[in-house]
């Protein structure tokens, strides 16, 4: 039975609009290929990190994904996120 998840991505702040849209659409396509439904993507904007750097960046662009998925689909997507150069960090939570 699918469960509700929320994944927050922190992506490189130097991505322009077109590469960012390509990144988001490719990530949504990967989710849908794994049987994920009800995908909502919210751009939370650029934020400065609190006194530290991530891969030499002092700020990042926060993108929130809300979706319903099976646990194995989430694991497959997270594997893809770990190797993506544009994603600085990510975290997934099960909600509900």
Swiss-Prot record:
Gene Ontology biological process terms from the UniProt entry: translation
The text of the family note is: Belongs to the bacterial ribosomal protein bS6 family.
One Pfam family matching this protein: Ribosomal_S6
Q: What InterPro entries does UniProt report for this protein, alphabetically?
A: Ribosomal_bS6, Ribosomal_bS6_sf, Ribosomal_S6_plastid/chlpt, Transl_elong_EF1B/ribsomal_bS6
Provide the taxonomic classification. Bacteria, Bacillati, Cyanobacteriota, Cyanophyceae, Synechococcales
State the organism named in the record: Synechococcus sp. (strain JA-2-3B'a(2-13)) (Cyanobacteria bacterium Yellowstone B-Prime)
Role summary: Binds together with bS18 to 16S ribosomal RNA.
Alphabetized UniProt keyword annotations:
Ribonucleoprotein, Ribosomal protein, RNA-binding, rRNA-binding
Name by which UniProt lists this protein: Small ribosomal subunit protein bS6
Provide a Gene Ontology MF annotation, just one.
small ribosomal subunit rRNA binding
In its keyword annotation, does this UniProt entry include Ribosomal protein? yes
Q: Which domain of life is it from?
A: Bacteria
Name the GO cellular-component terms.
Answer: cytoplasm; ribonucleoprotein complex; ribosome
